[in-house]
Amino acid sequence: MLLCSLLLVSCGNGVDKPYAEIADKEVRPILKMAITKAGGLDTWQHIKTISYTKRSRLFLEDGTVESDRIQHHTYTMQPEFSVRIWWHEEGRRHEIDYSPWRVIKKTDGKRDESVDTTALKQNVMSGLYTLGMPFKLLDEGTSHNYEGTTSLKSGEEADVIKATYRPAEHQNHSTSDVWWYYLDHQNGRYLAAMVYHRPTYAYIQNLAFHTDLPVKLFRHRKSYRVDSLRNVQFLRAEFWYTDFKIEMAEANTD
């Protein structure tokens, strides 16, 4: 079922199975520690809905603000996966409704027939992918490689996991970009990520988390344009996540 891929649910086979299916054995204990640190796989699997507000500010190379947008997100994870995102821009209301069978973009209540539905779907799924880290590293079809440790400029020593994706083969993959994830070597805390989106690199720093939720979710992040060695060129974006509401599904006692 598609829902199993989206939620990383092993469909009753226990929480150890996703880790056992990771080919690189060095990745397994590191990722398990990171997911435990973030609240645990079982907790993530039992989320029914997540809603939150996201503010995104994009910057040009000279520091000028390119855009400043506030969006409201609702993800229904089970029993049937769906997404609703809405925001106001230039006096108009925009809304995206997504399910595994369709994706619709509306402006002021009218369906936008000109929208690229493939790109829209990728954007929606990328949002869940970002929000669900590090849990989403267990998505079916993800290829992992352990690349040792590195010292981040923020001072932490981090384990580096490289992740690659094949969207042509796996419908739950939203990108073919190459990602690197930086997890605290001592406790598995998700510190940062880097993505190669041809022809540029972006380094995303996780600055603060909400720690009063069933799982640990972002509060504040910054994204920098960097080179392949993570040398910063300029601040590209800043993100704030607020107003989280999480509804948990009832545990199956069978």
Protein language model features and the residues they cover:
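N-terminal mature ectodomain segment of secretory-pathway/periplasmic proteins
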Residues: 22, 33-111, 147
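Bacterial signal peptide processing site
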Residues: 12-14
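Edge/loop elements at the starts and ends of beta-strands within beta-rich repeat scaffolds
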Residues: 43-47, 154, 215
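Flexible, processing/modification-adjacent segments and terminal tails
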Residues: 102-173, 197, 252-254
